[in-house]
From Swiss-Prot:
Residues 91-106 have a biased composition (Basic and acidic residues). Residues 173-195 have a biased composition (Basic residues). Residues 235-244, 317-342 have a biased composition (Low complexity). Residues 17-66, 81-415 are annotated as: Disordered. This is Uncharacterized protein UL61. The lineage of its organism: Viruses, Duplodnaviria, Heunggongvirae, Peploviricota, Herviviricetes. It comes from the Viruses.
Amino acid sequence: LWRGVLTTIEVSWRPTVDPERFRPHPTSPPHRPAHTPQPGGVRGADPGWAADGGRGVGDHAQGQQAATVRAEFFWGAAGEGSVTGQANAQDKADREPAARPRDPRSRLAAGPSRGGRGAQPEPPRGSRRETRKPSRSTPLPELLTGPPAPNLPGPIAVEPGRRPSPPPSTRPTYRRRRPTAATPSRKKKARRGPKASKAGREGELGGGSPVAHRGTSLGTGVRDPAPRGGRGRARTPGPVHSAAGGPGSRRRSPGAARDPGPEPGEERGGGGKPPLGSPRATDGNRDPGAGVPARPGRRMGGSSGGRGGTPGRGPERAAPGARPTAPDGAPGRWDGPADGPAPGLGRGGWGVGREAGGSGRSVRTAARPEPCRGLRRGAAGTPGFIGFQMPRLGGRSGNFPPPRPMPGTGLALPRCGRPVEKYRRMRTAHI
């Protein structure tokens, strides 16, 4: 219902230009009335100017959320010549046939013998019968042809055309327990873990002295069991534990040779992580390094909104970088973003809904895509992020290392790989 109401409002509302509030763009042609058909645009789009993006069509709206498509036009201030997504409703109306009248033979109208409830008298509005469901405890007398059958397994007499009910089950009613997972034998269990070499006898897999297996995958030597996150140090160099970054090492990060992981006694989860903001931090939760557009996280940005309009296809289609004409008739130029969006470029719409603000796709991808609207520059996850405002923790707490202040800012950086979402609430106004 709400969607219907909103769409109706949206479709019926046309932006009008109040000459007092919106001065036309200095180089814009006089405002044309809304009904003059224009070349260009998409599928009978609302009139823009030929060089503009036409109407964005919200077929990229996610799920139920209708996208309000704002094709920002080349000439226009926000109110002038811009179209605020009448797209969806109209499109939907074009694509879907009108609802068909209900077939009188449907089950609702059918009599009780065909599984329906027969034609019911319309209850007076507001009566309690509207809300109450018919009780299911009493069997419908039409279903049984004779007196109820004696309490024996076997089909009940049923009116022809209906399937007889299955015989009542004679099994006891307790639930079968699911079999538990097979427990590994004790000997096998003992073979894992730090003292694996003592398990089993000589000649068994993993048994005997580790030196006997040197050079094989079992010859990893006596190990220091590693605290969580470290890799236990093998005192016998085997093929698995060659020098960090060497051919046999299991680490795949490009910086492995420069940045050996933590010593076994040190409890820093994972390998050595590059500091936040270094160009090597490729993790999506951190500063992705210069020039990499932020990947919008899950909470930031619902649907990505509609596509921006496709460039107009009229005879006056502007070449990129040139305007058809300036008001005085001289050919004009597009001097950059200060002149409004680039010619022929509709901007993506905004998603509507709880998590509005997807990164709208534009028709022609700009050189540096702007991150989605929910993120200001410098917020977590965008290039230019300095760090989170952290509480000053004494010692350790949870899995925080003690924060190290960053010179020049009053900020401390979290040094552990918890996802950014955890800190999102701590973000303060100056970031």
